[in-house]
Structures are given as structure tokens and as C-alpha cells.
Amino acid sequence: MKEKILITGATGNLGKLVLNNLLEELPASQLSILVRDVTKATEFKDKGVTVYNGDYNNYDSLISAFKNIDNIYFVSSSDISNRTKQHENVINAAKEAGIKHIVYTSFIRKNETETSPIAAVANAHLKTESWLKNSGMDYTILKHTIYADF
């Protein structure tokens, strides 16, 4: 049986690029997406991608979406003020649902001082990476730079 992959944030810039590239390599039946607004995902649903309505703030929606999924491409939250708790929800729900592997979109610079304008982002990534490392799940941490080409 082919492994199922779920991409979070698939209607955003990065998630959409990842999904479109995966659609070139894999059948849509292997792909699922988690989106907050399903009306923004009709183009992918029409291609045969399974669309789940969910939110990083809603733990139950994550559990529902992650059932029968093997791997998650986890796009970090854009909600800076809530992202630490949201990321914790994603990792805990993935573990509870039996996810085999998470690919997490982290950040390359994480040695910021507390007065740095990007300290909140860096600290959230550090915590998320720590949770992943201690989760017992297989993981890959991508160390992205700041996105400037969208």
C-alpha cells in the first residue's frame, strides 16, 4: 500500500508549491491537505487530493485529519503570537494519530537575542524542533531562510 502524505498550509505560498511538486511525482490519491478554508482548496480537490478542514488551534480537527496518514509536511504557522502552542498541538496530534514521519519547515537563524525582531520566530522554531526530537517519531527538519521570492 502506498504511503499517504498530508501537507499543512497547502493554500499558502509554500504549501501550494510543495503540493504542486508532489502532484508531478505522485498520484493525487496519495496526497491530502489540511486547510482552514476549504473553499480555497477546490482546485486541489478537483484534482483528487483529499481536503481536510482543520486548524492548528483545534486539536480535534488535527486528530481527524491525521488519521490514516503516514507522513506530514508541516508548514510552520504564520500566527506568530500563537505559533508555539499551535506547533505543540500539531506534534502531539501527529503522535497520537500514529504519524510515521514529519517534515518540519524550520528556520536557519535561531541564535537571536531577546531584543532581536525575529526572536519570537526563532524561539518558536527551537521549541518545535525540541518537541520533534523528543516525540519518538521520525522527523526531518528543513532549515529555511526568510522567504523573499513569493
Regions found by a protein language model. Name each.
Residues L6, I33-A97, K110-T113:
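NAD(P)H-binding glycine-rich loop region in Rossmannoid oxidoreductase-like domains
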Residues L26-L31, M137:
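A generic structural motif
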Residues L26, V35, K143-H144:
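Conserved SDR Rossmann-fold cofactor-binding beta-strand/turn motif
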Residues E3, S29, K100:
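Nucleotide donor/acceptor-binding cores
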Residues L23, T42-K45, K133:
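Class I S-adenosyl-L-methionine
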Residues S76-F150:
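Glycine-/Pro-rich loop/turn segments that contact NAD(P) or position catalytic residues
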Residues K2-L26:
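N-terminal Rossmann NAD(P)H-binding glycine-rich loop of SDR-like oxidoreductase domains
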